[in-house]
Each structure stands twice: as C-alpha cells, then as structure tokens.
Amino acid sequence: MFKYIGDIVKGTGTQLRSLVMVFSHGFRKRDTLQYPEEPVYLPPRYRGRIVLTRDPDGEERCVACNLCAVACPVGCISLQKAETEDGRWYPEFFRINFSRCIFCGLCEEACPTTAIQLTPDFEMAEFKRQDLVYEKEDLLISGPGKNPDYNFYRVAGMAIAGKPKGSAQNEAEPINVKSLLP
C-alpha cells in the first residue's frame, strides 16, 4: 500500500517538474528567427556559394589546372582549358552544378591560384534545376576575394612567352639546383 502511494507521489512530481520546464521555456528568448526580416548569423568560416576571383591586374586567376574538379567528391565541377597568345592558360568554360555541390570546400583548398573561393552567400534557391548550373560568367566576380594581393603568375615564376624566367616584375632569378649539389 505504501509502495503504491509512493509511486503516485513520484509520478505527480515528475509531471509537475515537466510542466515547470515547459512553462519556463515559454518565457525565454525564441530560437526561431523571422528570416527575411531578421538577418541570420553566419560563422566566420561558413561555406556558401562558390565564386571565381580575379588577380590584382583584373585578369581571371583560374589557370584551368583541373585540380578543383579532381578534388570534388561529387564531380559537380567541369572545365576546359584554353591558352592565350602569351602562353597563359585560362578556362574556356567553367561550370558548377550547385544541385550536386555539397559545399565541402575541397575545391577551394585544392586551387593553387586561390581563384575558386567560397563566400557566405547561401540564398541560391531556384524553381528549375537547370538554373542551378552556373557558368563562368555567373561565377566570375570583379574583385580579388579573400587574397587581394596574390598573383599566381608573379609568385610561381611561370615563364611568359617572349621572356625568360626571372625577368618579370617581382620575380627572382631562377636558381641552378645542380650547382647546390656536393
């Protein structure tokens, strides 16, 4: 009999504790945001829409090395390499299918020229799936992105047609590695 009364008291206490918890949550600040009216907080390293950037001279940074397409685990990046008269590579077309992209950031890490970068933009909703396939013109932005002073062709020491290595601006003379051997 005492066990039965003890179970009733224990059950009533559990119910009262649950009611207090529910009512206390009713007076707290709400976690739900009214999205279009209230801006959403994004962490500093949020990975959103992918963009292609330009170097400080205004030319596109992408050298069509295809490393981003190889690093992509879902294969949503495709591009075709072309070459200018001075020997510089560029993508003839660059295409990203955002309906397949998982925004993992591996393409950004693989890019040697920092041409492909992820931005905090996440508003990419479309009614048709075909509109989620972005071409180079849709991805290319006018600015340098996260690395404003980086220029791959100056840093890498790439030979420019008509000029020997080491003769470009801000470029050191090449080192003869064989002379360093013992």
From Swiss-Prot:
[4Fe-4S] cluster 2 binds at residues 72, 101, 104, 107. It comes from the Bacteria. Residues 52-82, 92-121 form the 4Fe-4S ferredoxin-type domain. It is an enzyme of class 7 (translocase). Pfam families: Fer4_7. It is found in: Cell inner membrane. Its cofactor is [4Fe-4S] cluster. [4Fe-4S] cluster 1 binds at residues 62, 65, 68, 111. Belongs to the complex I 23 kDa subunit family. NDH-1 is composed of 13 different subunits. Subunits NuoA, H, J, K, L, M, N constitute the membrane sector of the complex. This is NADH-quinone oxidoreductase subunit I.
